[in-house]
């Protein structure tokens, strides 16, 4: 048994490049695990730098210098963000306030509907249980309102931090894009010399992460806009707010779509009842989700993601549990990284040293 373990160890860890790759991976994961909070602005800047690299490279290809290309792309990107911040988000925020205001009325309708269930299905429903559930929901709604107020007050403390980030992140993005090669060379100088295997994994992952981030942003925009137009077609209340939630839900594969369906169905049900409008609106929503999963995702991520759905779900749950939001966002790239490392890891044959 011991001899088998020794042979396995020599096969897997006798290559210096494999050891160098292992050291790099352990150091990288340790830094992210222990300092993810401090590195949040840098992580945001890296994600945005990946996103802006493609248009920067296109401008550079037609004759712009790297500095001017990075400046133009960053200015356009900040302009789009400001447009979103001053046009889209205030409307979505206002609709969120209206939704919270209307929740007690929705709860009363739900309670009235639930009260009729014992009469309709006496063998399945107990009036006492229904009343207890309704009272519990009312209590939770009141507590939720208090929590929203407390959270709003507590969030004021983070406004200064947010203001600092709004200045730091664009600056970091600019320098990450403008001085990309210099920074990569600086990183290479501190890495182990035997890093051929690590370089192989990096080259594969770099392109996949680029495709993934660019594809995710495009998927969010397409799904969000399509959902908003579909909801507008039926005059659904809080259409922009729900569309924004649906757009962001694509960040969490499978789980996000399931969770965001609950408020969509709830709002449509309370507005339309179980009539034709409800089923038509819900059908349009399901069609958008189906087109996203079966058409848009394969087109955008055919080169970036080649993982089984169960692996994706487990990656979101495990990595998201370790690193929160960033774990959820990077769950698929990290799972792809693990797969690439496993495939690239040397499986050297042990030679007979006795001869």
Name these PLM-found stretches.
Residues 1-90, 94, 173, 335-355:
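Anchoring transmembrane alpha helix of integral membrane proteins
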Residues 3-5, 15-19, 55-62, 68, ...:
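Juxtamembrane membrane-interface segments in integral membrane proteins
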Residues 6-17, 137-140, 210-215, 232-234, ...:
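Short, amphipathic, aromatic/basic-enriched membrane-interface segments that mark the entry/exit
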Residues 16-17, 155-269, 275-281:
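Alpha-helical transmembrane segments and their immediate interhelical loop/hinge regions
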Residues 22-27, 31, 43, 71-84, ...:
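Generic alpha-helical transmembrane segments of integral inner-membrane proteins
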Residues 39-43, 225-226, 236-266, 294-296, ...:
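Transmembrane helix boundary and interhelical junction motifs in multipass membrane proteins
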Residues 65-73, 126, 130, 195-199, ...:
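Membrane-interface starts of transmembrane alpha-helices
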Residues 278-355:
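Hydrophobic alpha-helical transmembrane segments of membrane transport and translocation systems
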């Amino acid at each position: 048994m011991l001899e088998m373990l020794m042979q396995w160890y020599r096969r897997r860890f006798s290559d210096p490049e494999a050891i160098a790759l292992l050291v790099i991976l352990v150091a990288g994961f340790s830094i992210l695990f222990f300092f993810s909070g401090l590195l949040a602005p840098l992580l945001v800047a890296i994600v945005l730098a990946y996103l802006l690299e493609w248009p920067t490279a296109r401008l550079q290809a037609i004759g712009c210098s790297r500095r001017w290309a990075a400046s133009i792309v960053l200015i356009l990107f900040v302009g789009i963000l400001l447009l979103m911040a001053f046009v889209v988000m205030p409307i979505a925020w206002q609709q969120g306030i209206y939704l919270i205001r209307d929740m007690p009325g929705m709860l009363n309708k739900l309670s009235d509907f639930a009260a009729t269930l014992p009469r309709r299905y006496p063998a399945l429903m107990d009036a006492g249980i229904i009343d207890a559930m309704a009272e519990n929901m009312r209590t939770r709604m009141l507590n939720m309102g208090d929590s929203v107020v407390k959270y709003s007050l507590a969030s004021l403390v983070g406004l200064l931090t947010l203001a600092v980030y709004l200045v730091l992140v664009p600056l970091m993005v600019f320098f990450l894009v403008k001085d990309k090669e210099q920074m990569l060379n600086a990183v290479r100088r501190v890495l182990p010399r035997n890093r051929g295997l690590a370089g192989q994994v990096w080259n594969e992952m770099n392109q996949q992460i680029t495709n993934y981030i660019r594809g995710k942003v495009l998927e969010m925009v397409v799904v969000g806009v399509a959902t908003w137009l579909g909801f507008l077609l039926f005059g659904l209340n809080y259409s922009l707010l729900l569309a924004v939630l649906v757009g962001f839900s694509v960040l969490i594969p499978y789980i996000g779509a399931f969770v965001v369906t609950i408020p969509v169905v709830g709002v449509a049900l309370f507005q339309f009842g179980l009539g034709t409008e409800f089923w038509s609106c819900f059908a349009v929503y399901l069609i958008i989700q189906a087109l996203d999963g079966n058409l848009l995702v394969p087109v955008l991520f055919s080169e970036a993601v080649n993982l089984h759905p169960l692996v994706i779900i487990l990656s979101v749950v495990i990595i998201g549990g370790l690193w929160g939001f960033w774990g959820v966002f990077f769950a698929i790239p990290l799972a792809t990284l693990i797969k690439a490392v496993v495939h690239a890891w040397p499986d050297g044959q042990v030679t007979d040293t006795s001869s």
